[in-house]
A protein has these predicted regions:
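Extracellular loop and loop/strand-boundary signature of outer-membrane beta-barrel proteins
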Residues: 115-116
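N-terminal segment of the mature soluble domain
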Residues: 26-28, 39-103, 137-142, 172-177
Length: 181
């Protein structure tokens, strides 16, 4: 009986130690700089990085990486001058040795007042694109950003509504891109 009990305990211990050691490795994510085509809006870059880093950290199974090899791959791709396309993202993923590459382009970010009777209303004008390439499954993700939300102007007097909505769009696009199959 002691031998059976000893083998049973050894089996349980072996299972308890081997299961956690077989955990899958996290996929590496490269976050490329924002291609900002909005003149004079430097705050969008800060919002982009802050929201993107937090969104990637919140996704289980993904880890954000930044190294010299990835920086060199980005500089060789010349994304800021040539534009973002599938081939350039594939090249960055291959040369930078990362699993997922995410990039975003912002073309328009403005608050436009609408003249209506009664309260003044602001309309958000948000245009851009989100790009991602997943080297693990070969999926290329492109999504157009459009913002047409409206809000009373009185509510926006103490906070930056346009950049908050842009940050929300960044979080949504990263979540969608990392789930793309």
């Amino acid at each position: 009986m002691k031998k059976v009990l000893r083998y049973l305990v050894m089996t349980v211990l072996a299972i308890c130690f081997t299961i956690p050691l077989n955990a899958a490795e996290a996929a590496t994510v490269a976050l490329l700089p924002l291609v900002n085509n909005v003149a004079g809006d430097e705050l969008a870059n800060q919002v982009y990085y802050k929201q993107a880093i937090n969104a990637i950290k919140a996704q289980p199974g993904f880890v954000l990486v930044e190294n010299d090899q990835l920086t060199q791959a980005f500089e060789n791709a010349k994304i800021n001058t040539a534009g973002i396309d599938q081939k350039s993202l594939e090249k960055i993923a291959k040369d930078g040795d990362v699993d997922v590459v995410f990039a975003m382009q912002l073309d328009k970010l403005a608050r436009k007042p609408l003249n209506r009777t009664g309260e003044r209303v602001l309309k958000l004008e948000l245009e851009g694109k989100a790009f991602a390439y997943n080297r693990l499954n070969g999926v290329y993700y492109v999504h157009n950003l459009k913002g047409g939300k409206e809000i009373d102007e009185a509510l926006t007097s103490r906070w930056d509504w346009a950049h908050e909505e842009f940050g929300r769009a960044v979080r949504q696009e990263i979540s969608r891109a990392l789930r793309a199959k």
